[in-house]
Amino acid sequence: MTGTNTFNNADLSASIPEKWGSMMLEQKFPEFVLQDFASDLSDMIVDGDIVHVPNIYTNTFTASTQSTPGTEVTLQSPAEVDVTITVDTQKYIAFILDDKTMAQVARSYNLSEKYAQMAQKTLLRELEDALFGLYTSLTATALGSTIAAIADLDFRSAIAYMEGLEFRDGTAVFMGVKTYFNQFIGLSKISPNYASNFGVVASGLLGNSGQAGTQVKGVAYGIPVFTSTRVPSPTAVDKNVMLHSSAYGFATKKLQGSSKVRTQMDYKLENLGTLTVCDIVYGVGILRAEAGVVINSLSTSTVA
């Protein structure tokens, strides 16, 4: 029997609570793979604003022939080249959480810490983008194709270029995610992460060897391959790079301990709230322009 005048949600709305759980949907960030790989010169810039790295390979020795016994030897003094990185780019993120609002916000969310972490990772992403942007200064930028998918020959040509310049160890590849998953992973010479034990990275090719096994996506011809959403892709052409660790250099000012990003908090009476400022001071630059090669690929292409 259907009753009449039964209670419904509208009748009981004053007694039905709305709940907020502990879950919070947070911003996603890339893995900072290039910061872990490039030459970190931060320890050199405790004071000052320019890092100097002597280049003794541009001007080199040549072998002399001793034609006449007893003849005085010919001395050589190849000039060094001064390679510099200026560390003076400062970026920051600042916000205030006022007392009234924070007294009303659920404490389980720990908003101050969450927003500080978001700001820190945003600034680290700026550094990652600056490093990826250095591809335009590499000597070799024309491998691959701007109108087609990456091919096995493109990868082997990059290896031939690197080994032709004596770069055999300490090399890695950084690819756009579309190039890797829609094109490159289908090549027979690639061993994806799930199919390999990665002895090649066990020695800690990256600065943080604990992350190497999780960040690396595959190994091709013995070279670890990493992916990143920060690989530049002008006009839908991914600028994938094969790099030696000495190709790119960067430095950050250690404003707070060993962290790249400094976080400061200060209560502001005039604002009745807590000010949080995160900042980073960094510089990036090419150390060896010939120690890397751009492998172009059309990011919209697919390979079955």
Q: Residue locations for each model-derived region?
A:
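Extended, solvent-exposed, turn-rich assembly/linker loops in the middle of proteins
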Residues: 137-215
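Short, structured patches in soluble enzyme cores that scaffold and shape functional sites
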Residues: 89, 99, 175-177, 280
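Well-ordered beta-strand positions enriched in small/hydrophobic/aromatic, beta-favoring residues
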Residues: 95, 173-174, 276
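Short acidic, glycine/tyrosine-flanked loop/strand segments centered on an H-E-D-like triad
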Residues: 79-105
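Alpha-helical scaffold segments that mediate packing/assembly in large oligomeric complexes
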Residues: 101-169, 294-304
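Sequence/fold signature of self-assembling virion shell proteins
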Residues: 2-37, 42-60, 84-88, 106, ...
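Active-site-surrounding "flap" and adjacent substrate/cofactor-binding loops of secreted or lumenal enzymes
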Residues: 58-81
